[in-house]
Amino acid sequence: RLDDPQRAVACAVEMQLAMTSVNERNRQAGYPEVALGIGINTGEVVMGNIGSQKRIKYAVVGRAVNLTARIESYTVGGQIFISESTLNDCGDILRIDSAMQVMPKGVKKPLTIHEVGGIGGDFRLFLPPKKEITWIELKHGLPVQFTVVDWKHTGELGHGGAITRIAHNMVEIHSEVLPSPLANLRISLYDPDDHEISDDLYGKVVAHLSESPPAFLVHFTSLPPEAETCLTKFLGAALN
């Protein structure tokens, strides 16, 4: 259908809006909150039953599918990113909150991806405005070790640093190195006495603050309960 790109974006917005009720049920049941990052692309694909008589599945394959996965990998929870082709096919009914250039693997030229905040027309679905981030300064930084995650491969925890500011699902880290923008990190968190709290935090570099000394912002994509408890404790202590 000609309006497939528009319906896909509308579906993505509805999914994000539905996360409020999903997480409300999770809280009532004692489960952790979850978040979605959604990537959308438009292009030609091969679709159908693929396999043999022993094993067969209905699948979608092709370069457009691979690029969609790459676009999704740049998101953090709550975001919807679309490609230029999807933007062009949707027309001017989209609310675009931001755009950035990326260089995914397997692509020869930089691509512009767009963050969707809503869709008008017959759909009239919009995400709420983003809340202003409230940062809390820490008197004493929390030590961390981190490494860059290259898709499914994780290296050794080799880079040291310290968390100097905390916000909801975000931290500011000062370190000896400056990871690339949008790099995925695995982080080990320590208390002020250098006792390990967790070595299983994951986050994405969402902004560079300084090159010398290196400082950057990380948006958490996975936060174990023990790490969340620690950060919430320091956040609450700073507010009090």
Model-derived features: where do they sit?
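A short glycine-enriched loop-to-beta-strand structural element that forms part of the catalytic core
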Residues: 32-48, 199-207
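Cytosolic regulatory/linker segments at or just downstream of nucleotide-handling modules
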Residues: 77-149
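Short strand-loop-strand
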Residues: 148-182, 186-189, 215-217
